[in-house]
């Protein structure tokens, strides 16, 4: 079941759902707007000949931060990682779904490639997979509304929520745009 604005506010007021910093004006009829943080991860295209999800490639990306008051410019065809300004903490009976903003999608900005799902129990900044599919550069301003977080109530609390020892939650507590850690659970078939 998708939470309404009144349910979202009730979860926040009860201290079960954490969105920090929180502004009530960001609550929409069935979502909460999230804003863009100041940090970005850009790909170092000259460090590797290819991306291998089975290997740890620490120098694949570099962390960059625009000067205060300046935007990050995302050029056509480029892909970078960003993150939400807000730290989001979900209880064990709520899952999240990050969606893009329609107004930004109409400009050619994709907010996530595939990873828009947030497990119950997750706590941290949500990493954004930002792509420009337009024909012109797009300026990304830290603090701008970048997406909307929809919240779904589970039929029962998760037995092993994200962050529990059994799950192997490699992104729990992440701060800023976090690079892929796919190598930590990659299994090659023989």
UniProtKB/Swiss-Prot annotation:
Pfam families: DCD. Transmembrane segments: none annotated. It catalyses: dCTP + 2 H2O = dUMP + NH4(+) + diphosphate. The record marks 116-117 as: Important for bifunctional activity. Residues 162-184 are annotated as: Disordered. Pathway: Pyrimidine metabolism; dUMP biosynthesis; dUMP from dCTP: step 1/1. It is an enzyme of class 3 (hydrolase). The active site is at residue 129. It comes from the Bacteria. One of its GO terms (biological process) is dUMP biosynthetic process. Residues 171-184 have a biased composition (Polar residues). DCTP binds at residues 101-106, 119, 127-129, 148, 162, 174. One of its GO terms (molecular function) is dCTP deaminase activity. Keywords: Hydrolase, Nucleotide metabolism, Nucleotide-binding. Its EC number is 3.5.4.30. The keyword Nucleotide-binding applies. Belongs to the dCTP deaminase family. Homotrimer. Bifunctional enzyme that catalyzes both the deamination of dCTP to dUTP and the hydrolysis of dUTP to dUMP without releasing the toxic dUTP intermediate. HAMAP family: dCTP_deaminase (MF_00146). This is dCTP deaminase, dUMP-forming. It comes from Mycobacterium sp. (strain KMS).
């Amino acid at each position: 079941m998708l939470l309404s604005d009144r349910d979202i506010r009730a979860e926040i007021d009860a201290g079960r759902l954490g969105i920090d910093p929180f502004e009530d004006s960001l609550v929409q009829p069935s979502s909460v707007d999230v804003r863009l943080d100041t940090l970005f991860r850009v790909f170092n295209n000259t460090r590797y000949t290819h991306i291998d999800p089975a290997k740890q490639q620490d120098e694949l990306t570099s962390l960059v931060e625009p000067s205060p008051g300046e935007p990050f410019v995302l050029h056509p065809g480029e892909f970078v990682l960003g993150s939400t300004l807000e730290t989001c903490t979900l209880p064990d009976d709520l899952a999240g779904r990050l969606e893009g903003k329609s107004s930004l999608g109409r400009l050619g900005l994709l907010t996530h490639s595939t990873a828009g799902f947030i497990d119950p129990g997750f706590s941290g900044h949500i990493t954004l997979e930002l792509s420009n599919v337009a024909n012109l550069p797009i300026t990304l301003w830290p603090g701008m509304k970048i997406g909307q977080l929809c919240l779904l109530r589970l039929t029962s609390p998760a037995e092993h929520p994200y962050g529990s020892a059994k799950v192997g939650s490699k992104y729990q507590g992440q701060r800023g745009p976090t690079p892929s850690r796919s190598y930590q659970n990659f299994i090659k078939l023989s």
